Curated annotation (Swiss-Prot):
GO cellular component: extracellular space
Protein name per UniProt: Bombyxin A-1 homolog
Gene: SBXA1
Species of origin: Samia cynthia (Ailanthus silkmoth)
InterPro entries recorded: Bombyxin (IPR017097), Insulin-like (IPR016179), Insulin-like_sf (IPR036438), Insulin_CS (IPR022353), Insulin_family (IPR022352)
Cell location: Secreted
Protein family per UniProt: Belongs to the insulin family.
């Protein structure tokens, strides 16, 4: 009996130490609390990679830059933390991207 209890305690401790990789939905105060906890009160806006003006056309040199951006689809659609963690589940690792 003691061995089973001891094994259960160690198993629970191992699960708690390994972290939770299961995605969860975080909204409102819960999102702010989790972000504060994960980032140790030092969170900021997630940055997108810099795209230099010479790469503006994305290899679509025959198009005007504005039209190339429209066809790209991904550019200009930066997702904020609410889109990533409130509208759909996210993991703690995704929250770390905002630290």
């Amino acid at each position: 009996m003691k061995t089973q209890v001891l094994f259960l305690v160690f198993a629970l401790a191992a699960v708690m130490v390994s972290g939770d990789a299961t995605p969860h939905v975080y909204c409102g105060r819960r999102l702010a609390t989790m972000l504060s906890f994960v980032c140790d009160n030092q969170y900021q806006v997630k940055r997108t990679p810099y795209i230099s003006p010479e790469n503006e056309g994305y290899g679509w040199r025959w198009l005007e830059p504005q039209r190339a951006r429209q066809l790209d689809g991904a550019r200009g659609k930066r997702q904020g933390i609410a889109e990533e963690c409130c509208n759909k589940p996210c993991t703690e690792n995704e929250l770390l991207g905002y630290c």
